[in-house]
């Protein structure tokens, strides 16, 4: 098995088929909806809040609301009352099962439910998928996070409509340092490995450091990527604003950090400061334009044409052409 990550792979151009990059279609379908770009902000308290989620839904983007200190039933009701789709996160603890029962009792079905735990290849995830599929059968279920083909196969067999691949590669995640496990340093290889067996969409979660990494994720089998650091640090970001001299930053921390947990227990995340980048909308438009350029370099017109290109693995004098 080849081991590589985003920083030591480059994609190879093919003959361009468009006159303008603006002709290239970056949209992707997930469930019953299409979205402008294959990018979803990480479901973290310092990346998304209710206002950002509503704006994204109204402007053609996919979102997943975080699951911390939130009344999910009220959130779903409010989003759907606005004419927006509802996309929520759940864990696998008794309160999460209670939320499913409350939604079913009130005949409210969120369009998307993400089962979001650090080690998603677990009996508890199988139980939660089964509960959701039984009580809220119309919901599109995303389950994760996982790191192996075996896990993807199991989650699909258990009923997941999509899987989230990535254990610990994020900028504020320290899972590999604390536990010795994860996909940090080889996330792109893990994605390729998992995509070979997947029959449903994969969301690559973590390790994205530049817009070009989004195109690389699509090439190696992702339908969408979940991005934290690149979409934190905006004017609208819910993280606390910190000023140091003449510079302004936004607080950004992992869901398994003590800053999110409120206690130092089973910590696998840390806190950093992200320079404020300006409005979120500007970054999303730039991502779309950069993906259009990627599609044009791939010799295509649609997003998935990126999957047709060859690539090189960089390694000093020993670059490998694939």
Curated annotation (Swiss-Prot):
Disulfide bonds: none annotated. NADP(+) binds at residues 202-225. The active site is at residue 173. GO terms for cellular component: cytosol; GMP reductase complex. HAMAP family: GMP_reduct_type2. Catalyzes the irreversible NADPH-dependent deamination of GMP to IMP. It functions in the conversion of nucleobase, nucleoside and nucleotide derivatives of G to A nucleotides, and in maintaining the intracellular balance of A and G nucleotides. This is GMP reductase. It comes from Verminephrobacter eiseniae (strain EF01-2). The gene is guaC.
């Amino acid at each position: 098995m080849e081991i590589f990550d985003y920083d030591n792979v480059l994609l190879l151009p093919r003959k361009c088929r468009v006159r303008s990059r603006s002709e290239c279609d970056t949209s992707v379908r997930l469930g019953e909806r299409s979205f402008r770009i294959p990018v979803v902000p990480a479901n973290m308290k310092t990346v998304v809040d209710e206002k950002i989620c509503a704006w994204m839904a109204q402007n053609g983007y996919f979102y997943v609301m975080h699951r911390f200190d939130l009344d999910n039933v009220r959130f779903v009701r409010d989003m759907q009352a606005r004419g927006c789709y509802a996309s929520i996160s759940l864990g696998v603890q008794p309160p999460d099962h209670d939320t499913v029962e409350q939604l079913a009792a009130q005949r409210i079905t969120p369009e998307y439910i993400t089962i979001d735990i650090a080690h998603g290849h677990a009996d508890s995830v199988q139980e939660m998928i089964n509960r959701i599929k039984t009580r809220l059968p119309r919901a599109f279920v995303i389950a994760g996070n996982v790191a192996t083909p075996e896990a993807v196969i199991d989650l699909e067999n258990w009923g997941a409509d999509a899987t989230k691949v990535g254990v610990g590669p994020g900028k504020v995640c320290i899972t590999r340092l604390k536990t010795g496990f994860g996909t940090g340093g080889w996330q792109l290889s893990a994605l390729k490995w998992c995509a070979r067996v997947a029959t449903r969409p994969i969301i690559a979660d973590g390790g994205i450091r530049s817009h070009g990494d989004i195109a690389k994720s699509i090439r190696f089998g992702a339908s969408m990527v979940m991005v934290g650091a690149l979409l934190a640090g905006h004017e609208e970001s819910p993280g606390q604003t910190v000023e140091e001299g003449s510079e302004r930053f936004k607080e950004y921390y992992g869901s398994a950090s003590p800053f999110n947990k409120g206690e130092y227990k089973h910590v696998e995340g840390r806190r950093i400061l992200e320079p404020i980048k300006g409005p979120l909308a500007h970054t999303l438009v730039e991502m779309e334009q950069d993906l259009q350029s990627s599609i044009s370099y791939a010799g295509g017109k649609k997003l998935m044409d990126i999957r047709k290109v060859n690539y090189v693995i960089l390694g000093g004098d020993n670059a490998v052409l694939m």
